[in-house]
Amino acid sequence: MNWQIIFTEQYTRKAAKFIKIHPDLENQYVKTLQLLEVNPHHASLRLHALKGKLDGLYSVSINLKYRITLTMIITEKEIVLVNVGDHSQVY
């Protein structure tokens, strides 16, 4: 069973801005979301819990430089996307 990815209005605006600035990453971004929907624990996503001010959030990698932060509601198999950007922007 696939996970349900929830795109908030705020995240959708951030993602559109991210793709506008980095059109070369659009395919990688889409592939990351597709893999996240099928298996958020896939090794290539490098899913990990965040600490400090982002405690309660998780992060997955688009590539070595760019990340998506998210919340995971494991019991309902929902993933709520929070932010997208480079390491310094999302952390």
What name fits each language-model region?
Residues 35-60:
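A short, surface-exposed loop/turn module that caps and links secondary-structure elements
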Residues 14, 31-32:
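A ubiquitous structural signal for well-ordered alpha-helices
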Residues 30, 38, 47, 87-88:
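Generic detector of bulky aromatic hydrophobic side chains
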Residues 2-4, 13-26, 62-91:
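Enriched for short, Lys/Arg-rich terminal
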